[in-house]
Amino acid sequence: MRCGPLCRFLWLWPYLSCVEAVPIRKVQDDTKTLIKTIVARINDISHTQSVSSKQRVAGLDFIPGLQPVLSLSRMDQTLAIYQQILNSLHSRNVVQISNDLENLRDLLHLLASSKSCPLPRARGLETFESLGGVLEASLYSTEVVALNRLQAALQDMLRRLDLSPGC
């Protein structure tokens, strides 16, 4: 008789029964802290202060600006686009910010699942491959504009998280 899996399960049972779910308030606090950390990282990059997030730069319209109403799914979609843009820049300045965005998206998914509205994994820009020429021609401008707009979007997300956004 093969009882290996059953014996392993019974051996792990005391540990599994003691595991507590992470309180949603803790997830929300971690989300806010990570947003503040990303904003601080953007502030530490000195050249991001040279362009306003509202300023229009020709050819960079694919970088999202502020959204009127941000649901959790819209926040995730926006972060996916920024993450895709930052990954394409190949700049040492944005590697950690891009990693932080991935972690932030995971926290948003936890918040959404706590509200019984699991989010599908958002994709970035579908036409992104055609923008390669724009990115290569203006890496510095793209980085500055993307980081400024990301910072504004994150600060807006931080305010909206207090209002308990919908799915």
From Swiss-Prot:
Subcellular location: Secreted
UniProt keyword list: Disulfide bond, Obesity, Secreted, Signal
Gene3D superfamilies tied to this protein: 1.20.1250.10
Secretion signal span: 1-21
Pfam families, alphabetized: Leptin (PF02024)
GO cellular component assignments: extracellular space
Record flagged with keyword Hydrolase: no
Molecular-function GO terms, alphabetical: hormone activity; peptide hormone receptor binding
GO biological process: activation of protein kinase C activity; adult feeding behavior; bone growth; cellular response to leptin stimulus; energy reserve metabolic process; intestinal absorption; leptin-mediated signaling pathway; lipid metabolic process
PANTHER family: LEPTIN (PTHR11724:SF1)
Function: Key player in the regulation of energy balance and body weight control. Once released into the circulation, has central and peripheral effects by binding LEPR, found in many tissues, which results in the activation of several major signaling pathways. In the hypothalamus, acts as an appetite-regulating factor that induces a decrease in food intake and an increase in energy consumption by inducing anorexinogenic factors and suppressing orexigenic neuropeptides, also regulates bone mass and secretion of hypothalamo-pituitary-adrenal hormones.
Annotated protein name in UniProt: Leptin
